Design a protein with these regions (language model features):
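PAS/PAS-like sensory domains across diverse signaling proteins
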Residues: 29-31, 41
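PAS-associated C-terminal cap
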Residues: 1-11, 116-126
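Short loop/turn elements at sensory-signaling interfaces that couple input to output
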Residues: 99-114
C-alpha cells in the first residue's frame, strides 16, 4: 500500500502492526498478500509462511474454503461489506473461530479482512446449548419455557 503522505504511511504502519485485530489482505485469487503480526500470532504462523499462499491454508477444509468464497469473498468483491463468524484452522490444525469482517480495498482488486478470535465465546455458547438441552429433558415444557423465554 502506497501513500503520498509519509506521515499517513507511518501512522498506517503503526496501526497495522500494533492493533488488537488480526488483519489480512488477499488478492482476487484469494492469495494472502499481507498479514499483520496479530494475525500471525493468532494462527501460529510466521509472516513468511503465509505471504503468497492461498487462503485455503487457513480454512478447516476444502468445503469450508469454497463455502467462504461463496458466502463472503464474492460479496466483498462486489462491494458489499461482510461480517460473520467463521471457523478457521491454526498452523497446528487446531480450530479457531473468528468474527471476520471484509471490505474491498479502494481502487484495487484486493480485500481487507479484519479478524477477532471468538473461540472461547463459541465454546461457551455450545456448552450453554448442551446444558439447556439436558435441562429440557428434566423440566416440564411450561417450566422450561418460562425460564428460557424471559
Amino acid at each position: 500500500m502506497i501513500f503520498k503522505n509519509n506521515q499517513l504511511s507511518s501512522r498506517f504502519k503503526q496501526v497495522f502492526h500494533n492493533t488488537g485485530f488480526g488483519i489480512m489482505i488477499v488478492d482476487k485469487n484469494r492469495n494472502l498478500i499481507e498479514v499483520n503480526p496479530k494475525f500471525c500470532r493468532m494462527l501460529g504462523f510466521k509472516r513468511e509462511e503465509l505471504i503468497g499462499e492461498n487462503a485455503q491454508i487457513i480454512h478447516i477444509s476444502n468445503k469450508a474454503y469454497k463455502d467462504f468464497g461463496e458466502k463472503a469473498f464474492n460479496l466483498v468483491r462486489n462491494k458489499r461489506p461482510v461480517n460473520l463468524d467463521w471457523p478457521f484452522k491454526k498452523k497446528n490444525n487446531e480450530k479457531i473461530w473468528f468474527r471476520i469482517a471484509g471490505d474491498p480495498v479502494a481502487d484495487k482488486d484486493e480485500v481487507l479482512w479484519t479478524v477477532v478470535d471468538i473461540t472461547e465465546r463459541v465454546k461457551a455458547k455450545n456448552k450453554i446449548e448442551i446444558l439447556a438441552s439436558k435441562l429440557s429433558r428434566y423440566l416440564s415444557p411450561q417450566v422450561y419455557q418460562s425460564i428460557f423465554s424471559g
